[in-house]
């Protein structure tokens, strides 16, 4: 199991580098595909569609695609309109097929657009910032890096449960280790890339601060995804990534972290 997780993790890192470094259309298409797969996993878990692919799911996917097109065409001022249009599409399916769908399915369909597609899109938006190729790294340090540090510290000295009912294996000590580890990794990252990233303000201290805040947010994202799985009585969202589960199982913390790293980078750097 560990070997499978490790190999899958290496493949994910290679894919991340191969899409983030060139950015542009390569990253856009990759994120759009990941978002749609993640939405499908969430819709299945939340029973938006009982069997097959129905109108409600298609409305959610269409809304996500329209939102992503505003980013591709560099028309970010229309992104809010795109999100509202997604809501109109979903509500249209609801009213014109009534009583096929229930209100909770409608809310889940719209939740999928925002929770998965919109929030993941901030990886692309961060990449498009000045020095964005380097800033995207902070998203993954704050999520995957923090998670690894939290796991190691928790295994070594974890005693006090962070969320005993929801996630019994997570400890307060592990959480602290995750935040501290992310801050340290962020600082080291700044030192390593300074030769290629001379932008003012991109100091080790700032990167450490951003990664520490991002790590705190990533814990919420991780636990939130776990809470949904517990509510729906499923172990994983999917089986796409061997040893990890589905897209949402691997990107649960990234989903929450990406928007905050984007805004922190805009404010602090």
Walk through the language-model features, giving the residues of each.
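Hydrophobic transmembrane alpha-helical segments of multi-pass transport and channel proteins
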Residues: 212-220, 247-255
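Re-entrant/interfacial helical elements at transmembrane boundaries that shape
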Residues: 155-156, 227-233, 255, 259-260
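Interfacial loop-to-transmembrane junctions
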Residues: 230-253
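Residue-level recognition of oxygen-bearing side chains
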Residues: 167, 171, 246, 259
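Juxtamembrane boundary at the C-terminal end of a transmembrane helix
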Residues: 262-269
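Short helical (or helix-break) motifs at transmembrane helix termini and adjacent helical loops
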Residues: 144-155, 218-230
């Amino acid at each position: 199991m560990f070997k499978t997780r490790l190999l899958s993790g290496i493949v994910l890192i290679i894919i991340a580098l191969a899409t983030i470094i060139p950015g542009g259309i390569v990253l856009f298409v990759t994120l759009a595909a990941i978002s749609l797969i993640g939405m499908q996993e969430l819709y299945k878990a939340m029973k938006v569609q009982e069997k097959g692919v129905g109108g409600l799911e298609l409305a959610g996917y269409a809304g996500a695609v329209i939102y992503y097109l505003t980013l591709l065409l560099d028309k970010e001022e229309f992104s809010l309109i795109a999100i509202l249009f997604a809501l109109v599409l979903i509500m249209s399916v609801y009213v014109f097929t009534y009583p096929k769908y229930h209100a909770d399915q409608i809310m889940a369909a719209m939740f999928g657009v925002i929770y998965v597609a919109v929030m993941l899109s901030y990886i692309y938006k961060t990449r498009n910032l000045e020095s964005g190729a380097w800033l995207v790294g902070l998203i993954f340090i704050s999520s995957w890096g923090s998670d690894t540090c939290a796991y190691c510290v928790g295994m070594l000295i974890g005693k006090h449960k962070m969320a005993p009912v929801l996630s019994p294996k997570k400890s307060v000590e592990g959480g602290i280790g995750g935040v501290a580890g992310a801050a340290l990794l962020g600082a080291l990252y700044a030192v390593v890339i300074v030769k290629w990233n001379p932008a003012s303000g991109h100091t080790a201290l700032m990167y450490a601060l951003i990664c520490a805040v991002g790590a705190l947010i990533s814990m919420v994202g991780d636990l939130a995804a776990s809470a949904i799985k517990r509510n729906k009585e499923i172990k994983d969202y999917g089986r796409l990534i061997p040893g990890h589960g589905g897209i949402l199982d691997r990107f649960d913390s990234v989903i929450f972290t990406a928007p905050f790293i984007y805004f922190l980078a805009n404010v602090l750097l």
